[in-house]
UniProtKB/Swiss-Prot annotation:
Source organism: Haemophilus ducreyi (strain 35000HP / ATCC 700724)
Family: Belongs to the ClpX chaperone family.
Amino acids binding Zn(2+): 9, 12, 31, 34
The protein, known as: ATP-dependent Clp protease ATP-binding subunit ClpX
Disulfide bonds: none
NCBIfam families in the cross-refs: clpX, PRK05342.1
Gene name, Swiss-Prot/TrEMBL: clpX
GO cellular component: a single term: HslUV protease complex
Domain ClpX-type ZB positions: 1-50
Length: 418
């Protein structure tokens, strides 16, 4: 299997192509995400990682409108216009709901507003995590990411589901009120589906058990969290967090869901087994199919109905094509190419990529099926030798300009130096 050949993080299991950096040790690897989490844990989040100066009233006054949220997403995320619009509205309404609860429902004449958690469906590298992270950054709220495949139900070996809340608390110096404004992104939610849509003895008990445990958090409960590493709570007393106030965004690739949707939408009524799917030539593309997703499709895929009911906002993300990947390399704020150009500029050297080189990078990512997530790894490997030699070469040869061409990507040619 490719997974066995490709180095992966010994802690979270993510492959090298799925992370920005993978550091090798004597007997394993650790990715940049796990390094960051470890740093926060070891340092006890001494300083709040977000601005905690706003009280509730001031915070809710400053919640951006859907148009403002969408505009901010445009700065960092290429494409996915429908998903951006859906997220902008859902997030805006979520914080209106919290504001209404704070006023004891006076703004709605006693009407309680339900919470609309979100399910993002899209292939690896389509921007699910980036969208959620960018939302949290714009709103200035705590943000935590959890991998559903590492979570276990009570009584099993692994990471307890409530550890997700602990991660969120770490991001705001264990301030429960700040955490309750936060956003939690649960990735790989599709990997904990049960094996059959019909409850039976053959189902994936552990997978469904994790779904049940997540359901409790997502629908709302008071979680009592042990604040490990907190200097605010040195005696180890638990912190109560009301999860009904936290916005949960779940994401997954849901490989094979298109076949479930297609079977429902294309099946023609007939006698006995006469119903059949349309031929491949009439098959709709993946994006079109995912726009037709219904809760019943997710049940057939293996999510429990109760969990689907707590994720009412379902939005598909498009698979990124060549043009979108090229745009991701160059256009957003903090674009990958811009970051490397800044690194080279610190050495007094101009870094350029030809159009053909950018196209080749995008094509390589498509072949690897890593989407936008794999772009940084490709560029990093492409420039590794150059960055290694650069400090020496610029002094000995007076290098001021480096150009990366198509051959560098496809054939391993060295960049041109001048």
């Amino acid at each position: 299997m490719a997974f066995e050949k490709e180095p992966h993080c010994s802690f979270c299991g993510k492959r090298r192509s799925e992370v920005d950096q993978l550091v090798e040790g004597c007997e394993g690897y650790i990715c940049n995400d796990c390094i960051e989490e470890s740093y926060v844990l070891l340092n006890g989040a001494e300083e709040p990682l977000i601005d905690d100066s706003q009280n509730d009233e001031k915070f809710f006054e400053n919640v951006p409108t859907p148009h403002q949220i969408h505009a901010h997403l445009d700065d960092y995320v290429i494409g996915q216009e429908h998903a951006k619009k859906v997220l902008s509205v859902a997030v805006y309404n979520h914080y209106k709901r919290l504001r209404n609860a704070l006023s004891h429902h006076q703004e709605t004449n006693g009407v309680e507003l339900g919470k609309s958690n979100i399910l993002l469906i899209g292939p690896t590298g389509s921007g699910k995590t980036l969208l959620a992270e960018t939302l949290a950054r714009r709103l200035n709220v705590p943000f935590a990411v959890a991998d559903a495949t590492t979570l276990t139900q009570a009584g099993y070996v692994g990471e307890d589901v409530e550890n997700v809340i602990q991660k969120l608390l770490m991001k705001c110096n264990f301030d429960a009120e700040l955490a309750e404004r936060g956003i939690i992104f649960i990735d790989e939610i599709d990997k904990i589906t049960r094996k059959s849509e019909s409850p039976s003895i053959t189902r994936d008990v552990s997978g469904e058990g994790v779904q049940q445990a997540l359901l409790k958090l997502i629908e709302g409960t008071v979680a009592n969290i042990n604040p490990q590493g907190s200097r605010k709570h040195p005696k180890g007393e638990t912190i109560a967090v009301d999860t009904s106030k936290i916005l949960f965004i779940c994401g997954g690739a849901f490989a094979g869901l298109d076949k479930v949707v297609e079977a429902r939408t294309h099946t023609q009524s007939g006698i006995g087994f006469a119903a059949e799917l349309k031929k491949d030539k009439d098959r709709e593309d993946l994006t079109s199919l995912f726009k037709q997703i219904e809760p019943e499709d997710l049940v057939k895929f293996g999510l429990i109905p109760e969990l689907i009911g707590r994720l009412p906002v379902i939005t598909p993300l498009q698979e990124l094509d060549e043009a979108a990947l090229i745009a991701i390399l160059t256009k957003p704020k903090n674009a990958i190419i811009t970051q490397y150009q800044a690194l080279f500029k610190m050495e007094g050297v101009e870094l350029k990529f030809t159009k053909d080189a950018l196209t080749a990078i995008a094509q390589k990512s498509i072949v690897r099926k890593t989407g936008a997530r794999g772009l940084r790894s490709i560029v990093e490997n492409l420039l590794l030798d150059t960055m290694y030699d650069l400090p020496t070469l610029k002094n000995s040869q007076g290098i001021t300009k480096i150009t990366v061409g198509k051959g560098c990507v496809q054939n391993g040619d060295k960049p041109k130096m001048a």
